[in-house]
């Protein structure tokens, strides 16, 4: 763990479970990481691995049939230390933090915007609640945010409803809403999924400006390893509710020591290697969340697995900044 002065958010042994029909889905099962001020932590992994649930837990936006079973979520606000997991989900203190100090860009813009209010109203609502701006200043700021997101004719679009926006424009409106109050922590869940590459570059540049100008800490959830290589300072690889490997971007991308990390990297085509390059898909699929394998969750899909993998490995420090949860990490590191 880093010095607390450099940490914006610290998650320690977090466990978030879902309960349905007398069954329990351990969606997040003992996750620990730090997000440093002015740095980007990229969280990668297949769908269903617990990335979005981790983000929703930090924001206290979990559904009714879910519970934080154990762990801490510590938000370092100036000189104050706030345990988010102890706050009421819709209590006054959590509402003050959410959207202002910690903001989130949601994965699905189609359902995140309210269809009965204009897009401008929904962005302005955040500014009205969390700032001292007057109506004219709020409107100017809202138009400026839409302009920065590359939305054409923002003076007109600000008064239009979500159905008038394309999918990509709705995504950009959601990003504008999240960036409105210059948050201390920005959680971005697949923020550029519906956007073309030029707009993606523009959005990532804006996120970079937040880091540079306001020392914002960013948690970026993505499947795109190219984005990870370009933007990440630190990387956490998740699989079935656990972080299986974490470290600096250089550690994880250049020296992967968990078979899942290596499999993810091997499954991505590399520009410049030509059409005959060997791309290796990950065999099998993620297990049923209600019928998990014993021990290492990746073992049924792993080429290195043996009997030792019937017991979940402890976290091992490869270096001061590089951690892995695997019995076979030495073999993989040498491979």
Stretch-by-stretch model annotation:
Residues 72-96:
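ABC ATPase NBD Q-loop/coupling interface
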Residues 81-82, 248-335:
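Charged, flexible cofactor/metal-binding loops and thiol motifs
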Residues 136-151, 158-159, 254, 262-266:
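ABC ATPase nucleotide-binding domain helical subdomain, centered on the C-loop/LSGGQ "ABC signature"
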Residues 160-165, 169:
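Conserved ABC ATPase signature
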Residues 180-184:
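A short, proline-enriched helix->beta-strand linker immediately N-terminal to the Walker B motif
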Residues 187-191, 195-277:
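P-loop NTP-binding/switch modules centered on Walker-like glycine-rich loops
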């Amino acid at each position: 763990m880093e010095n607390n002065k450099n940490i914006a958010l610290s998650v320690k042994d977090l466990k978030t479970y879902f309960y349905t029909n007398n069954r329990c889905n351990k969606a997040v099962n003992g996750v620990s990481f730090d997000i440093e001020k002015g740095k980007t932590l990229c969280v990668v992994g297949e769908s269903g691995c617990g990335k979005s649930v981790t983000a929703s837990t930090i924001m206290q936006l979990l559904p009714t049939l879910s519970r934080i079973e154990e762990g801490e979520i510590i938000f370092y606000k100036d000189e104050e230390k706030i345990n988010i997991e102890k706050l009421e989900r819709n209590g006054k203190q959590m509402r003050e933090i959410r959207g202002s100090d910690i903001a989130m860009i949601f994965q699905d813009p189609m359902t995140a915007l309210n269809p009965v209010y204009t897009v401008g109203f929904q962005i302005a609502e955040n500014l009205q609640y969390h700032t001292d701006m007057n109506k004219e200043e709020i409107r100017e700021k809202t138009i400026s945010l839409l302009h920065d997101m590359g939305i054409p004719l923002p003076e007109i679009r600000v008064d239009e409803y979500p159905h008038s926006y394309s999918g990509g424009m709705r995504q950009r409106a959601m990003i504008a809403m999240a960036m409105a109050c210059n948050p201390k922590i920005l959680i971005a869940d697949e923020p550029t999924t519906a956007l073309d590459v030029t707009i993606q570059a523009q959005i990532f540049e804006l996120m970079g400006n937040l880091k540079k100008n306001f020392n914002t800490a960013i948690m970026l959830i993505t499947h795109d390893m190219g984005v990870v290589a370009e933007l990440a300072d630190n990387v956490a690889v998740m699989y079935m509710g656990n972080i299986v490997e974490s470290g600096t971007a250089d550690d994880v991308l250049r020296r992967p020591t968990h078979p899942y990390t290596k499999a993810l990297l091997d499954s991505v085509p590399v520009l410049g290697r030509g059409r005959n390059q060997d791309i290796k898909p990950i065999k099998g699929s993620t297990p049923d969340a209600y019928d998990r394998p014993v021990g290492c969750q990746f073992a049924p899909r792993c080429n290195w697995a043996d009997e030792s993998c019937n017991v979940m490995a402890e976290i091992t420090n490869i270096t001061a900044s590089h951690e892995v949860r695997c019995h076979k990490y030495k073999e993989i590191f040498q491979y």
